[in-house]
Swiss-Prot record:
This is NADPH-dependent thioredoxin reductase 3. The active site is at C454 (nucleophile), C457 (nucleophile). It comes from Arabidopsis thaliana (Mouse-ear cress). Coiled coil: none annotated. GO terms for cellular component: chloroplast; chloroplast stroma; cytosol.
Amino acid sequence: MAASPKIGIGIASVSSPHRVSAASSALSPPPHLFFLTTTTTTRHGGSYLLRQPTRTRSSDSLRLRVSATANSPSSSSSGGEIIENVVIIGSGPAGYTAAIYAARANLKPVVFEGYQMGGVPGGQLMTTTEVENFPGFPDGITGPDLMEKMRKQAERWGAELYPEDVESLSVTTAPFTVQTSERKVKCHSIIYATGATARRLRLPREEEFWSRGISACAICDGASPLFKGQVLAVVGGGDTATEEALYLTKYARHVHLLVRRDQLRASKAMQDRVINNPNITVHYNTETVDVLSNTKGQMSGILLRRLDTGEETELEAKGLFYGIGHSPNSQLLEGQVELDSSGYVLVREGTSNTSVEGVFAAGDVQDHEWRQAVTAAGSGCIAALSAERYLTSNNLLVEFHQPQTEEAKKEFTQRDVQEKFDITLTKHKGQYALRKLYHESPRVILVLYTSPTCGPCRTLKPILNKVVDEYNHDVHFVEIDIEEDQEIAEAAGIMGTPCVQFFKNKEMLRTISGVKMKKEYREFIEANK
């Protein structure tokens, strides 16, 4: 592949740190965007809409009894096929709590955390800033940090965790079948904890500006240098929207909160914080019609409509963030398990039992009323205990006494500096390493742009680590923190994290935004190594 004519502009001696810029195109960069300059300054998915079929209320008479194929506790396989005790679909506080309890009961739960269909491992808390009402954290904790602790605890007790999407499942006959993007699993019970997905407004130009000015994750994208010092807007009037508005004041010059109703629905504490913040303006009775752009194709404003008068106005804003609620991710159970008219999984009151015996639901996928992290965790506990009782009472349980897994070794604890840089190593961090590798590496260079509060970034790292390990001698991996290396991110036009870029022979080959399947990264490396 021929090098872009502008690549290498300003390349100087490699004895001092350089800044790297890169393109933000989803496929290939405009040739003028990637260059290296000399400086001695060292600084730092697929979302989908839920079909909401009409469902009737379930009753005990509608509950299905599926026949078991295993007749004794020693039966862990049928016809040579391994049958797991329990598969947990989804993560978040519900899924991880269920995994902790199931693992401590020696059930060896298999957990499919998901990463695209409906969110990322850790659920909605991965897009939450400060969690101040979860017991045990008097000073609060960020959503991603809380989920990371829960995940490590589940892993410590022996849960098998896979960051894979479940593509289909069958619960009409036992054992149940779960098909993911990479494997097929048989199991005696299922805990369904897929949570809910952020809703979109479906504006006329939403797809055009998605991740280029429109976002449903303030903590993922708000730290982008392109939003720093700009006017931003948030849509919604609940806790999610008010929390996002408050968070964005750390970066924005001013934040506009666009509320359809004549009052906020958020908690009183959140309302007080918003109303008393001079950097936030609340617009009541206001509907978002569309986004506006300038002659350069960049988002420049929002078209608003007053619901009480019908008057339309234009609001200057460089970014629009959604905080308008969620839809339950129950699609995989449609036609198999009873759902209500909004798509929530119906469970027997006070339990996690669905209309199919052996299938349990936990978290926001079955809770349309409370929707709190602590209630989701509680329902995950109930689901795990219920699954254990179900397995025991049906003589299906097989105990697994396995050693506790060691905590994953911490990687990338410090940025590469001149005296510690070693090109023979595969994995690196920071702008110095990127500059050196850009000049000297004959391999494919995979660059991951992250930010400290980005939940999906924590999802993507282990995925990329596995891919990089598979191609250990064919790739170099560099992690760039966009807050530490702001100039790189700004020049690259990085408007959200995570973002991956591939380079080879001083040429940028491709940019991939968000979290994708491992095979997409594998196929690209295989084709270019």
